[in-house]
Amino acid sequence: MATEYALRMGDGKRIYLTKEKIIAEIEDGTANAADLGEIPALNANEMEKLAEILMMPGKTVSVEQGMEVPVTHDIGTIRLDGDQGNSGVGIPSSRLVGCMTHERAFGADTMELGHIDYSFKPVKPVVSNECQAMEVCQQNMIIPLFYGAMPNMGLYYTPDGPFENPGDLMKAFKIPEAWESMEHAAEHLTRDTVWVMQKLFASGADGVNFDTTGAAGDGDMYGTLHAIEALRKEFPDMYIEAGMAGECVLGMHGNLQYDGVTLAGLWPHQQAPLVAKAGANVFGPVCNTNTSKTSAWNLARAVTFMKAAVEASPIPCHVDMGMGVGGIPMLETPPIDAVTRASKAMVEIAGVDGIOIGVGDPMGMPIAHIMASGMTGMRAAGDLVARMEFSKNMRIGEAKEYVAKKLGVDQMDLVDEHVMRELREELDIGIITSVPGAAKGIAAKMNIEKLLDIKINSCNLFRKQIA
């Protein structure tokens, strides 16, 4: 009897497949992506490697030593303190505690602060509260800390916003009116996002994470690209990550263009150059999970799309890897076996520069991804490599080489806790364990500035305050 291997369906249900069936599913999945995106399918060696990853006997798997990448985040601390029946585990804790838990306990390379409603529009009335939270977090933390939110253009339509719902207008065959409503909403999205981030950047934020760009279609992406462009023009040193909502930009409007390119119907490899042109430092491509297909099919399809995006992108790519994207099952508690295999495949086959950790409980998302492919933040040198990706748009290889040279170590040492524990204390750039007298918060980041020859926004704010 043929050996069967434990895999998952796209909804997380466990299934058992033979190697022959796994290979067939991989071939079908990569062919689907190649056909839709008009991109190369995985070659025979890549498909064989993906099959090997899926068939590994361990519950968890990880990248080969030396291939680790930095992680970024969506939803911020909501996975800890959120309690809405989704992936939040409802731990009553402040956002400072949540952010520092990711930094000190989870070994995150970066982190983000976000509002419980997690969209830019609801932040406007409480922006002063967000600014104070950002200041307090920056005073206590060392890893890069973003402000994250969704552009969420749907909030600008009735009954939540001022503009008539284009869906209702289209049903009434009022197409020009629907276009006009989307265009007005996109303008307001740009304006609100820029205004919110002007306040947060003045409060020390390292940058911004645009989560689920394009969720409301091409108008949503249009407004976000113009927001990125405006922020880059005003703040040349702001870290900007733009993560997508889906693999293909929905043509709700159909005629909107950016830099002469029609946005409707763009696939990840076509989205990447536009996001870079707008001024983002890091692009977060997406491939949606099909819940009725196997993990072999979904992961092959996702890796195919991401490999093409990485090759086409002028900037680092942090593939979105929350539940329901990136070959990961659509389940609030994502199966760790599926998450770690997807994480490994994205790094070793697609060649991504990082992982954007998305929605899912703490064990199934940040802990699983960081164990599988992360650089473990301040336990080693993950935060330093992440800063070079964002401050200088360095791809993963260049960023590691730069940091290793500055530290005077081999690249393998960047993820060696024994080497980095001693070195971080010697250089006074922040250590993960609490040592009296060691530089913390702003002081440690000022030493990182000197080490890496960069400027850090929270340090600039502190210098202004004591001038």
Swiss-Prot record:
It comes from the Archaea. The keyword Acyltransferase does not apply. Pathway: One-carbon metabolism; methanogenesis from dimethylamine. It catalyses: Co(I)-[dimethylamine-specific corrinoid protein] + dimethylamine + H(+) = methyl-Co(III)-[dimethylamine-specific corrinoid protein] + methylamine. Disulfide bonds: none annotated. GO terms for molecular function: dimethylamine methyltransferase activity. The keyword Methyltransferase applies. NCBIfam families: dimeth_PyL. Catalyzes the transfer of a methyl group from dimethylamine to the corrinoid cofactor of MtbC. Belongs to the dimethylamine methyltransferase family. This is Dimethylamine methyltransferase MtbB1. It comes from Methanosarcina barkeri (strain Fusaro / DSM 804).
